[in-house]
């Protein structure tokens, strides 16, 4: 994936907004004001030339540990709470995995919203239907 593909994919989720509170070289993506993806663009104070293109994702502590142990391209996030955030060097990871992790980050943040808001972003599981009768 490239920067534009990541941006387009992340903005495709319901309720996502983007801003640049940390300068022109970083885009943050938010759901109801809560950041769940931070995308480094390069240049400026946060140049990616030495480290490579990356994004930071908010994931559960257990998931962060799991991904860091499986992928060299997933590391504790620079400038974020390392327990809850990982840097993903997305050019070194399959696109489908990057998309899966972005979606996972979105759903994690959505799951922490108040119930009335949460229902808007997390689809309810379908009711089981057996012989045409909802269970």
Label every model-predicted segment.
Residues 1-135:
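Charge-dense, helix-prone N-terminal extensions
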């Amino acid at each position: 994936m490239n920067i534009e593909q990541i941006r387009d994919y992340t903005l495709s989720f319901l309720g996502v907004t983007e801003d640049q509170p940390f300068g022109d070289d970083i885009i943050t993506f938010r759901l109801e004001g809560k950041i769940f993806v931070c995308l480094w663009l390069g240049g400026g104070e946060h140049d990616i030339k030495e480290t490579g293109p990356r994004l930071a994702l908010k994931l559960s502590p257990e998931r962060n540990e799991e991904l860091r142990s499986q992928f060299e391209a997933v590391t504790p996030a620079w400038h974020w709470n390392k327990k809850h955030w990982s840097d993903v060097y997305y050019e070194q990871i399959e696109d489908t995995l990057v998309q899966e992790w972005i979606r996972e980050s979105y759903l994690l943040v959505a799951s922490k919203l108040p119930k009335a808001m949460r229902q808007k972003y997390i689809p309810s599981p379908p009711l089981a239907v057996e012989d045409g009768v909802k269970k």
